[in-house]
Amino acid sequence: MIPTRKKFGREKTNASAPIRFLLRSSHTARKNPLTFSRIKRNLRMMKEKGYFLSIGAGPNQVPLISAAIGLGYSVIAVDRNNHAPGLKMSSLRIMESVTEYRKILKTVSEIPLQGEILGVGTRSYGKATYTASYIADKLKLRYASLESVGICSDKNLLKETAKKIGILTPENYDISTLKNQFPFVYKPSQGSGKEGIRTFHDPKEWESFLKSKKKNSRSRVSKKKTNADKEEWIAEEYIPGFEITVCGLIQNGKFFPASISHKDVTKYAPYLEIAHTLPFLRCELIGEILLNCRALAAATKMNDCPFVAEFRINPQGEIYLIEAVPEVGGEFLADTLIPNYFGSSYFENLVKLLTGEKIEPFLNYSKIPKKYAGIFFSAPPEGKSKLVEHSEFVIKGKEKIIFDRKLKQHGEILRTSEGNAIRTRSIGVLGPDQNDQTLENWKQSVLQRLEGKFESV
């Protein structure tokens, strides 16, 4: 397929084509010698550095694309949304879904490039990670192997792998013979974003759920099964305690930790994430946490890729693996919390990793400075409700707002069963250098000030 060039500000495209890519033109720049010389200099740099392929170009992908451009790479961005902000920043655009890995590979192979593709990556998750892995495999680039992605995307396979190397995981229960295993957690074997997760505390609650599920199944008019019908579900031991998130990178088999943050969730299922805070105060656990991460990376064959894992720590200090994937992870940790708290450039290191450059260790990830920081979310009450209004968030003392994003609009109907996607607002906050509150007290203060107004429907 031949690329079409912009002419006089318009793009000539074939609307019927299932996939297309567009070159940014320097036509108008020839009238300005300074601009033209800058473009020629950029082209020389591009030839020296080569290309970076970004699987996705949405808002969450912008930090990755920006880092690649900042390091001198010319970016090829893939996204089916013509208005994705990362497309405007990129030299080449492939208009396609990030899940269409074969089509993307075919198009990339047909582009008459002026240099080599030296790296591929994604800030997304799930199927986009598979696409990045597939293309990396075919183009002999760096990313987690397809085998590794397969293990980590299936909770049962991940548990089996973790158990073999001595990492604790919640025990699986046989759904057909549940008797005295209450409370237990019921969730999809694959998936993310907390959608569908529930906890059952007694047999009556479980029996009521099964009857309701059976009744709903019979009442469906369509013979087609929904995704929920087709999906495999698992029941597992409920682990009391708190959760942590570990972010890092793996290069040449070595794990580079970037942060260990404390995670808070709602008291009701599906346990929406409402806070990620620093510093992590349980210093005595850091060594074991990092040992688990290194062992897990080796056992799942993760290499030359990002790494994010979630653990649950019970009151006895025992560390249970909940999830681990070769992904950047979301929740504004890598792009906002880590750089603003530690001063580390996660995405610059990630691009270096994916293009074969040596990365430097993240500094200070385990130190406990006097300041606090966190990413906080406003979540609706359990069940179905309507957002009436957002709060007027007021800072206290020397607090500094990193960002403030309203994720939902007034009047929107929200169902907590849909997981993290129904949270209404997110805010990043740096606490004062000297704080007379405990981290827990400060956290609760921020969440109370952030809480919006909802009404039942």
Segments from the language model and where they lie:
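Active-site nucleotide/adenylate-binding loops and adjacent lid/helix of ATP-dependent enzymes
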Residues: 153-234, 239-240, 251-254, 279-291, ...
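ATP-dependent carboxylate/phosphate-activation module, predominantly the ATP-grasp catalytic core
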Residues: 223, 230, 238-302, 306, ...
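Peripheral (often C-terminal) accessory segments that flank ATP-dependent C-N-forming ligase machineries
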Residues: 45, 351-457
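N-terminal amphipathic/hydrophobic targeting modules at extreme N-termini
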Residues: 13-21, 221
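Protein kinase-like catalytic core scaffold
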Residues: 184, 256, 320-323
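ATP-binding N-terminal substructure of ATP-dependent carboxylate-amine bond-forming enzymes
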Residues: 38-147, 408-412, 419-422, 431-456
